[in-house]
Amino acid sequence: MEPAEHLFRQEAGRLVAILTRLFGVHNLALAEDVVQDAFCRALETWKFHGVPANPSAWLLTTAKNRALEILRREGTARRFAPELGRFLESEWTLAPAVEEQFGTGAIQDGLLRMMFSCVHPRVPEETQVALILHLLCGFGVAETAAAFLKKADAMEKRIGRAKKTLARSRRLFDLSGDDVAERLPAVLRALYLLFNEGYHGASAESAVRADLCAEARRLTSLLLDNPRTATPAAHALAALFCFLAARLPARLDPAGNLTLLGHQDRSSWDAALIAEGRRFLDGSAAGDELTPYHLEAAIAGLHAQAARAEDTDWAAIVSLYDRLMTIQSSPVVALNRAVAIAERDGPARGLEAIACIDDPGRLARYPFYYAALGEFELRLARPGRARRHFRAALALARSPMEKHFLEGRLCDCADVSPAR
């Protein structure tokens, strides 16, 4: 990504959040237009005068001046943010009110309010994540569509419908209200899905989207900076993200191929992120609620503390999966538990655990279900069965990297002699 593109993506969310607070969420399109105008002016100006020492401040000032111009010109013709209306109606209070919205504290507050607005209960879950990516992370419609393997025109319609839903509320979510705790789980879920899209993504270019993982971590840090949203569950989610992000440098080999956890070069794991994850996990211990994020973070933490794959405490991991199944039973969690059982007790026990999964039909389109079956059969020296499962996984692979990995496992089947 070009430096300017990276900067614009980084600043887009902040600017859209600030301007939406000023204009009102019903004028979201206007806020986006002002941001786009600021970026266009930057490209034109910087081309001749060079990039300023503080490009972020330059963009903020440009957007602020444009916002003031619009508010002065259309103050009586258009309805702006209801909660700022009395300040925006007078020239004496207009400039100070706008200036206040561009302060650091107001920017952070605006980003949080926008995040909570994006998970409006009438917006479908996958669209909530797409909306966060689009509005708060600066991803264009085409980029957002690519992240979810959707067509750009379909994603544009989906985002458009979600924006109309937000517009009907006329104002951003109020963080001082009593429904923060009610909507926070949806925010955490959206960030979890965003990170997951990066970590287990199906991009045509890469099986890993570190940029999506980084955005999920950045937005989670905003939650931890606000006392109303810095809950134990938010700390647990931050811990999970840190532990998993620490492994990203080893998740692909130098050729860009997927590397399984057991074969990763653990010396390349990010020790600072692992330490940060431990601090967040400690912070998640407050309170008396045990969430799936706590258990997933604890599992990832056990992997992170194992210096070698053979040092992994699989018994403890199976125990954590057992607890996870009691509060969030799903076929995918059950499959992960089966993999842990296979590591603890051997592949035959792993196959037995898979056979006991409730509603296995929900895994029928999940490539890693067949990949796990193939791995277990290969370890049991049954290459014929393994080959069938790997072929089924290959047919469902979502990216060239996944296909390449599974093709490699198919080739490995030829090197295994059938058990007698």
Regions from the language model: what does each represent?
Residues 1-6, 16-35, 45-53, 151-153, ...:
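Short, charged helix-capping/linker segments at alpha-helix termini
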Residues 11, 158, 389:
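Residues within the DNA-recognition helix of helix-turn-helix
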Residues 36-40, 53-82:
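Σ70-family region 2.3-2.4 aromatic/basic alpha-helix that recognizes the −10 promoter
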Residues 237, 241-244, 296, 300, ...:
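"A position-specific structural signal for the A-helix of alpha-solenoid helical repeats
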